[in-house]
């Protein structure tokens, strides 16, 4: 579901970019007709537009494919059109409740691989080679869980900081967008300049939602590890 929404975000971002590049291409053509730019400039603008259009076609094809897969997995006909709701934001309380020390202890207790190996230990003879090997394996796995929990914890912290930065950037672009809207109403801004600001604002919106999804993924990965669902290399 997260992957599907991320794809829709890319689609929305490209749609805004397409609108801007279409305007840039048309403006470049007019400038070329007036002798203000060369045909190479026109070609470059057209290539940029074509590249983004190709990217949009790829995203739309992937959107159909993912949607059909989701429908099939959920028991609908592959060509059904169910409403797929937006994924909710992370509850800040989930992050506030995180405690690396106690959560790491829970992860050690709950890890399925460690549980299996601890049970296997009960079937071995004390002092045997097999017992010694298993004890070393368990020790290495416990160290891996501890290290992974540290990494997952700081991944959440980093994702939260990235969201804060994205929200700050969006606030700035919102102010610029509001100003551009007022200027447009008064005829004080050209269409190309307005579309550039509109695209910058749309990009900032996408960045915030992308950061929200990134934070959700980081929190989910942390919670899964606490519940014992951490794959170990040993």
Model features per residue range: what roles?
Residues 95-144, 148, 152-155, 190-193:
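Small/polar-residue-enriched beta-strand and adjacent coil segments characteristic
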Residues 6-58, 161-209, 223-224, 230:
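Charged, solvent-exposed structural "stalk/scaffold" segments
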Residues 60-102, 114, 219-234:
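Short, solvent-exposed, mixed-charge loop/turn linkers that connect secondary-structure elements
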Residues 11, 18, 25, 32, ...:
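Leucine-rich amphipathic alpha-helices with coiled-coil/heptad-repeat character
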Residues 51, 58, 62-65, 123-126, ...:
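Charged, amphipathic alpha-helical oligomerization/scaffolding segments
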């Amino acid at each position: 579901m997260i992957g599907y929404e991320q794809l829709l975000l890319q689609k929305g971002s490209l749609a805004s970019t397409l609108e801007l590049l279409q305007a840039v291409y048309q403006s470049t053509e007019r400038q070329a007709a007036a002798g203000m730019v060369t045909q190479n400039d026109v070609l470059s603008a057209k290539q940029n537009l074509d590249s983004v259009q190709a990217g949009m076609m790829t995203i739309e094809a992937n959107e159909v494919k993912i949607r059909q897969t989701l429908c099939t997995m959920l028991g609908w006909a592959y060509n059904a059109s169910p409403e797929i709701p937006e994924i909710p934001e992370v509850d800040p309380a989930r992050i506030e409740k995180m405690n690396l020390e106690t959560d790491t202890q829970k992860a050690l207790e709950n890890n399925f691989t460690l549980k299996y190996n601890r049970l296997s230990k009960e079937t071995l003879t004390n002092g045997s080679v097999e017992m010694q090997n298993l004890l070393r394996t368990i020790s290495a796995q416990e160290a891996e869980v501890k290290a992974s929990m540290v990494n997952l914890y700081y991944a959440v912290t980093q994702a939260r900081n990235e969201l804060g930065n994205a929200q700050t950037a969006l606030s700035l672009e919102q102010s610029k967008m509001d100003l551009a809207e007022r200027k447009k109403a008064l005829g004080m801004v050209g269409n190309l300049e307005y579309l550039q600001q509109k695209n910058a604002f749309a990009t900032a919106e996408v960045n915030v939602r992308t950061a929200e999804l990134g934070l959700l993924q980081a929190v989910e990965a942390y919670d899964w590890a606490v519940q014992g669902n951490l794959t170990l290399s040993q």
